[in-house]
A protein has these predicted regions:
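Long, low-complexity, intrinsically disordered polar/charged segments
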Residues: 1, 17, 55-69
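Conserved pre-motif I regulatory segment
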Residues: 1-39
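Conserved nucleic-acid-binding Ia/Ib motif block in the N-terminal RecA-like helicase ATPase lobe
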Residues: 4, 8-9, 63-94
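Helical mechanochemical/support elements of P-loop NTPase systems and associated helical scaffolds
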Residues: 3, 15-18, 22, 50, ...
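Walker A/P-loop NTP-binding motif
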Residues: 24-36, 47-62, 83-87
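Hydrophobic transmembrane signal anchors and adjacent membrane-proximal interface regions, especially
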Residues: 12-13, 36-37, 51, 70, ...
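The conserved Walker
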Residues: 40-44
Length: 94
């Protein structure tokens, strides 16, 4: 299954019909730039805005750690983990 098709399934798994403008722009910028800062209100979709491009960059043939997400609190880390699991990817998160 290609990444584009899987991305559509991710949105379905999350009950989302389409990305909002911030998420679309963020995805393009994250995939094409090394340094990104997202400033957007709580509940605007920042987590998905950065998780989707991470998913796009992961390589299934690499079995070691490919991504490390640093967050300022355990609670935020747990929230991000929950979103990733709801996305329904084949990649492990912990």
């Amino acid at each position: 299954m290609n990444k584009k098709h899987h991305s559509n399934n991710i949105l379905l798994n999350l009950g989302i019909e389409s990305l909002n403008e911030m998420q679309e722009v963020a995805q393009d910028v994250i995939l094409n730039d090394n340094n990104v800062l997202l400033l957007s209100p709580t509940g605007s979709g920042k987590t998905l805005a950065f998780l989707l491009p991470i998913f796009e960059m992961l390589q299934p043939e690499i079995l070691s750690v490919q991504c490390l997400i640093l967050v300022p609190s355990r609670e935020l880390g747990l929230q991000i983990e929950q979103v990733w699991k709801k996305m329904g990817t084949d990649y492990k998160v912990n």
